[in-house]
From Swiss-Prot:
Pfam families: CTE_SPB4, DEAD, Helicase_C. Interacts with the U3 and U14 snoRNAs. Associates with pre-ribosomal complexes. SUPFAM superfamilies: P-loop containing nucleoside triphosphate hydrolases (SSF52540). This is ATP-dependent RNA helicase dbp4. Its main location: nucleus.
């Protein structure tokens, strides 16, 4: 027989592959039909303890087993069966009860049963209030969904927007925060949510709160109405308005611990202690020093308090690693700090409520609430960072005496068992003097302390529950002294909006609106010449606290409205003194700024307005800001110096008492010293005595000068006498002596010329027209008169005549 052809064999192979694909597709469809049938037959009210008892797909079961999830918690056993059937769910359970898996497993299963692929677009959207919680949910999703073929993405702020845009259109499951999700819905053209099947809100009561109200409403407008919605939180909302906004259809309320005697885990030991506000830092430092081998979370009201306490205690070196986390940090820093605290065995982290919800830090021993939480729900979420998954944990709440009664009522209403403890005085450590020393040596730390003080006072003032938070019952002066400040900063409180609306408003939206309004109002500045002095004043220190320092001492802060409409997140409102007074239309107080010739005519129009702003404290008289010229005046340090009071010069007497340079007496003091004639006579006597003393001093000075001159003359004469002793003496010549000996000893003019000639430079060479006679005439002219002796002197008269000629 002839061998079979090669073409026929290839056709058989390709046909076998097609048959294998077809069989696999049929097998998958059969499995899906069985799975769907099992889900339909599932009894949602049945008690299920293990994941293996649920009708789950193979990839999900493998992912759960690989992640070591085998047993269901209470909330999972009740919520997962309902979610698999496609029901809308309102889930409420204690912190650390496994709510994350209760919605992630149904998300994977429902998309798997619908054969969801990359081409189908976005199938599930999971929204969390904070970035850290979104990252944690995404990591759990990656673990249990590792065997699925879905594409999942994490959309949070602080990351590259362009990279997210490029990948967003291919995602099947998204974990996000509200702000960044809304930004992509408005700006990313390739992002489509029309096929969305499931919407999950983790920590739903926080997301539906007024802080995210605008963002969530805008997101819901983009989403389709036909979808499955699940809400999970430890403190679930039941407001009809919130549920109507989400378009829930016959939602199932799952509250496994609603009938429990406590809203917190039973393994959590909860205590509170009454500590006056000025003593809180001392108590906290003593507590940290006593628990160096523990893992501690300390909650505070604001990020500025977190910064100040961290920077202060870091210098004191308590003996345990310190970390701090707040919402104003960069995303990379927040991730780094979160991972460090999670992996550490013993450390202390100072944080705001940004870590109060959902985050799962392993093995947290203590949760310390340095500041009173705004409500009982916030307290429950804060203490939920410890005692998770049945483990033991401890929590301590520091309460001011004015906060004790009201807060205990709120906790009792929420079924929170808490016991009072007393702190021994010897367990606290007084760090007041050390903080004062640090603030004195480091001005930037002092200004950061002022910002922390203002931020805390503002947070108390803006709280809605006045039964707990009353700014008048708090010792602000003592608190300022306890954090090292020389005195309490002056704060002018203004009426603000609702506390949560102000506190939880998105900062990005506030900043963008402020920038837009500034750009509309302020015209573009002209290009001006910048001198070296301008650059010198624009320099700033690049320190870790330089930003806080510059904000506290900035004198060119833009003025804000005084009707309470300014941004409540800014602290400058509380540090400035402003009021509104009527100003006459004919006010002409612009004398200082008449040299500004390049101002427009609309400045004068603005000056005729019915109202003006009055600023006190800069000069002796209040400054009325009723025109644009006056507003520009506030930005010029040179012009403000003209308005400030000039200093007065003082002189100090021998005892150190200050006096004015010119002090005038009144009439009574003058008469007390006597009549005018008596004072005149007394003045003349004093002046005469002063003149006599001055004469004596002058005479003594003259005598001293004469004596000094006489001593100098005597010294000079004595020096001359010494020279004369060395000179030659003239005596009568005897018969044996040569009469020419004296004259021969005297120097002759020729010798002097020879001596001088030795010191002079060499003569220049003669020219061709010069001869010796010319040289001799020049020498004779220079030497002057020369005595020529024709014959040698023989008698004494001849010698005397020769000597007289030489001497003359």
């Amino acid at each position: 027989m002839a061998p079979p052809s090669v073409g026929r064999k290839s056709k058989n192979i390709s046909k076998g592959k097609v048959d294998a694909r077809t069989l696999k597709r049929k097998r998958v469809e059969e499995d899906l039909e069985k799975l769907q049938k099992s889900v339909d037959e599932l009894d949602a009210k049945a008690e299920i303890k293990n994941f293996s008892e649920l009708p789950l797909s193979g990839p999900t079961s493998s992912g759960l087993e690989a992640s070591h999830f085998k047993t269901l918690t209470d909330v999972q056993s009740k919520a997962v069966p309902l979610a698999l059937k496609g029901k809308d769910i309102l889930g409420a359970a204690k912190t650390g009860s496994g709510k994350t898996l209760a919605f992630l497993v149904p998300v994977l299963e429902n998309l798997y049963r619908q054969k969801w692929t990359e081409l189908d677009g976005l199938g599930a959207l999971i929204i969390s209030p904070t970035r850290e919680l979104a990252i944690q949910i995404f990591e759990v999703l990656r673990k249990i969904g590792r065997y699925h073929t879905f594409s999942a993405g994490l959309i949070i702020g602080g990351r590259s927007l362009q990279e997210e845009r490029e990948r967003l259109g291919r995602m099947n499951i998204l974990v996000c925060t509200p702000g960044r999700m809304l930004q992509h819905m408005d700006q990313t053209a390739a992002f489509d949510v029309d096929n969305l099947q499931m919407l999950v809100l983790d920590e739903a009561d926080r997301i539906m709160d007024m802080g995210f109200q605008t963002s969530v409403d805008a997101i819901l407008e983009h989403l389709p109405k036909q979808r499955q919605t699940m809400l999970f939180s430890a403190t679930q909302t039941k407001k009809v308005s919130d549920l109507a906004r989400l378009s829930l259809k016959e939602p199932e309320y799952v509250a496994v611990h609603e009938a429990a005697s406590s809203a917190t885990p039973t393994t959590l030991q909860q205590h509170y202690c009454v500590v006056p506000l000025p003593e809180k830092l001392n108590t906290l430092f003593g507590f940290i020093r006593a628990n160096l081998k523990a893992k501690i979370i300390v909650f505070m009201s604001s990020g500025k308090q977190v910064r100040f306490v961290y920077e202060s205690l870091r210098h004191l070196q308590p003996g345990i690693p310190l970390l701090h986390l707040h919402g104003r940090q960069k995303q990379t820093a927040r991730l780094d700090i979160t991972s460090k605290f999670s992996s550490s065995k013993n450390s202390c982290i100072f944080a705001t409520d940004v870590v109060a919800r959902g985050l799962d830090f392993p093995a947290v021993d203590w949760v310390i609430q340095l500041d009173c939480p705004e409500d009982a729900d916030t307290y429950i979420h804060r203490v939920g960072r410890t005692a998770r998954y049945g483990k033991v944990g401890r929590a301590v709440l520091f309460l001011d005496p004015s906060e004790e009664e009201g807060m205990l009522k709120r906790l009792e209403h929420k079924k929170v068992p808490i016991q009072k403890i007393n702190i021994r005085p010897n367990k606290t450590q007084d760090i007041k003097n050390q903080l004062q020393n640090m603030c004195f040596q480091d001005p930037e730390l002092k200004y950061l302390g002022q910002k922390a003080f203002v931020s805390y006072a503002k947070s108390v003032f803006l709280q809605k529950d006045k039964e707990i938070f009353n700014i008048n019952d708090i010792d602000l002066e003592g608190y300022a002294s306890s954090i090292g400040l020389p005195g309490a900063p002056k704060i002018k409180f203004q009426k603000g909006n609702d506390a949560k609306n102000v506190k939880n408003a998105p900062r990005a939206a506030i900043e963008s609106s402020d920038e837009d309004s500034e750009t509309e109002k302020k015209p573009k500045k002209k290009d001006e010449v910048r001198t070296k002095y301008d650059r010198m004043f624009e320099r700033r220190n690049q320190d870790v606290l330089s930003g806080h320092y510059s904000k506290m001492i900035a004198d060119d802060t833009p003025m804000k409205d005084v009707d309470g409409t300014a941004d409540a997140d800014e602290d400058n409102d509380f540090l400035s003194v402003k009021r509104v007074l009527p100003v006459d239309n004919d006010d002409t107080s612009d004398d200082e700024d008449d040299d500004d010739d390049d101002d427009d005519d609309d400045d004068d129009v603005a000056a005729t307005g019915p109202l003006g702003k009055v600023i006190e404290g800069i000069s002796k008289d209040p400054i009325v800001i009723d025109s644009k010229r006056k507003e520009k005046l506030l930005k010029s340090k040179k012009k403000l110096l003209k308005l400030k009071d000039r200093g007065t010069k003082l002189v100090f007497d021998e005892e150190g008492n200050p006096h004015q340079v010119y002090e005038l007496q009144d009439e009574e003091d003058f008469r007390a010293k006597g009549t005018a004639e008596e004072q005149r006579a007394k003045f003349l006597e004093e002046e005469a005595e002063r003149v006599r003393e001055a004469d004596l001093l002058d005479k003594q000075t003259a005598k001293d000068k004469k004596r000094e001159k006489r001593e100098k003359r005597k010294a000079r004469e004595a020096a001359l006498d010494d020279d004369d002793e060395e000179a030659l003496e003239l005596v009568d010549a005897g018969d044996d002596e040569d009469p020419m000996a004296l004259l021969k000893s005297l120097p002759l003019p020729e010798d002097e010329e020879d001596e001088d000639s030795t010191a002079r430079p060499a003569k220049r060479p003669k020219k061709w027209f010069e001869d010796d006679s010319d040289d001799e005439r020049k020498v004779a002219k220079r030497k002057g008169r020369v005595i020529e002796a024709a014959d040698e002197p023989e008698t004494l008269e001849d010698l005397e005549a020769l000597a007289a000629g030489l001497l003359n």
